[in-house]
Amino acid sequence: MADKAQQTPPPSTLRNNNYPGPQHPPTPSLPRRALVVGGNRGNLNRPPQRPPKPRGYEYDEDDDKENQGPGQERPPAKEEEEEGEEEERPDWSLRHLLGKWESDIEQLKDKVCRDLDNYKLKLGIHP
């Protein structure tokens, strides 16, 4: 019977710390760090910035000028001359803006349709 008295008590009594004997010291708690005023942490109330939108590749003819020697500049194309004439007209900017909006809306419409088709496939809805 003496052997049974020295055995470890059941776990339920260990959780309640009713076990007679040496107990572990409590875990020390660390003090809170002071907030840095004006530090480099940024404004925590400001929402995070969005990543930049991916843009399509736009070819710029000015990039080719570095490969040309002096005095070998290209003469302006007819389209560029016509654009210069249209800039003088007051309604050119409105027409240009409406045309740009039309192309942007078409691109957005195509992208939304592609995204919705992809979501349908992910959900298992086959067209």
UniProtKB/Swiss-Prot annotation:
Disulfide bonds: none annotated. Phosphorylated by host ERK. The phosphorylation triggers a structural change that enhances keratin binding and protein stability. Residues 1-93 are annotated as: Disordered. It comes from the Viruses. Residues 79-89 have a biased composition (Acidic residues). It is found in: Host cytoplasm; Host nucleus. One of its GO terms (biological process) is symbiont-mediated arrest of host cell cycle during G2/M transition. GO terms for cellular component: host cell cytoplasm; host cell nucleus. Keywords: Early protein, Host cytoplasm, Host G2/M cell cycle arrest by virus, Host nucleus, Host-virus interaction, Modulation of host cell cycle by virus, Phosphoprotein. Belongs to the papillomaviridae E4 protein family. The major E4 form is first synthesized as an E1^E4 fusion protein from spliced E1^E4 transcripts, such that the first few amino acids of the E4 protein are derived from the N terminus of E1. Contributes to multiple aspects of the viral life cycle including viral genome amplification, suppression of suprabasal cell differentiation and egress of newly formed virions. Induces host cell cycle arrest at the G2 phase by associating with and preventing the nuclear entry of host CDK1/cyclin B1 complexes. Inhibits cellular DNA replication by preventing loading of host replication licensing proteins MCM2 and MCM7 onto chromatin. Within the cytoplasm, associates with host kinase SRPK1, a splicing factor regulator, and inhibits its activity. Assembles into oligomeric complexes. Interacts with host CDK1. Interacts with host SRPK1; this interaction may favor expression of late viral transcripts. Interacts with host cytokeratin components KRT8 and KRT18. This is Protein E4.
